[in-house]
Amino acid sequence: MTTEDTLTIAGRSYQSRLLVGTGKYQDFAQTRAALDASGTQIVTVAIRRTNIGQNPDEPSLLDFVPPSQFTLLPNTAGCYSADDAVRTLRLARELLDGHDLVKLEVLGDPQNLFPNMPETLKATRTLVDEGFKVMVYCTDDPIQCRMLEDLGAVAVMPLASLIGSGMGILNPWNLRLIIDQSSVPVLVDAGVGTASDAAIAMELGCDGVLMNTAIAGARDPILMASAMRKAVEGGREAYLAGRVPRKLYSAAPSSPTEGLIAAVK
């Protein structure tokens, strides 16, 4: 893979196509070790759950994951309305000195964490109007993804399966439809369980993959982070290389017979 093959979001290019969350680790030191092993450049942070300066008497994630070394992606995990999500990202912009690249998620159900798309669309419209560059967690509905792009989202992030489920890529066909129609990056968000899931997403043509539980919840998070790095890179290279068509039978022998020396009688 050449250095020219980069992920570009909102005008900024990244060498890594793996985005990693910062929740569920043992401590901030393990978080940093996993991020380093993953090779990620974009790190997502749940503003409602992680201290990035709003609690000055507590350890801050920014001491371990400084904005000078990573692109921070504030997210609205835990928000169930457009209003809550917008307020949360306004706070993030204030805490991060005007940072405007954000990840929007508006949840609809606390049990399955499925996105509430009407509220998501409403929040996207407001945030774009306020100058945010919005990456949006959404369903794998191509129509909804097109609506988000039309509203000004800089990336759409359809779920592969439920958040934290580890179920992998359940509907590759919808993902392909979204990829084929989109002029903004398409990143799988939620549901990745192991390295092969990440590779499949990339082989389908996704521009990137975001994950948290698959790494933080592994028996060895640092080793899994390394595995995910290789899977994303390998899946991307396979997509660029182009797989052979699937066929029930080979159309011709894999070893051609033309030009072979005839057996001596």
From Swiss-Prot:
Keyword ATP-binding in record: no
Binding site for 1-deoxy-D-xylulose 5-phosphate: 164, 190-191, 212-213
Reactions this protein catalyses: [ThiS sulfur-carrier protein]-C-terminal-Gly-aminoethanethioate + 2-iminoacetate + 1-deoxy-D-xylulose 5-phosphate = [ThiS sulfur-carrier protein]-C-terminal Gly-Gly + 2-[(2R,5Z)-2-carboxy-4-methylthiazol-5(2H)-ylidene]ethyl phosphate + 2 H2O + H(+)
Subcellular location per the Swiss-Prot or TrEMBL entry: Cytoplasm
BP GO terms, sorted: thiamine diphosphate biosynthetic process
EC annotation from Swiss-Prot or TrEMBL: 2.8.1.10
Active site positions, chain numbering: 103 (schiff-base intermediate with dxp)
GO annotations of cellular component type: cytoplasm
Alphabetized GO MF terms: thiazole synthase activity
Entries under InterPro entries matching the protein: Aldolase_TIM, Thiazole_synthase_ThiG, ThiG
Keyword Cytoplasm: yes
Major place of residence: cytoplasm
Known role: Catalyzes the rearrangement of 1-deoxy-D-xylulose 5-phosphate (DXP) to produce the thiazole phosphate moiety of thiamine. Sulfur is provided by the thiocarboxylate moiety of the carrier protein ThiS. In vitro, sulfur can be provided by H(2)S.
Subunit structure: Homotetramer. Forms heterodimers with either ThiH or ThiS.
Family: Belongs to the ThiG family.
Classification via PANTHER family: THIAZOLE SYNTHASE
Protein's UniProt name: Thiazole synthase
Organism: Bordetella bronchiseptica (strain ATCC BAA-588 / NCTC 13252 / RB50) (Alcaligenes bronchisepticus)
Taxonomy of the source species: Bacteria, Pseudomonadati, Pseudomonadota, Betaproteobacteria, Burkholderiales
Gene: thiG
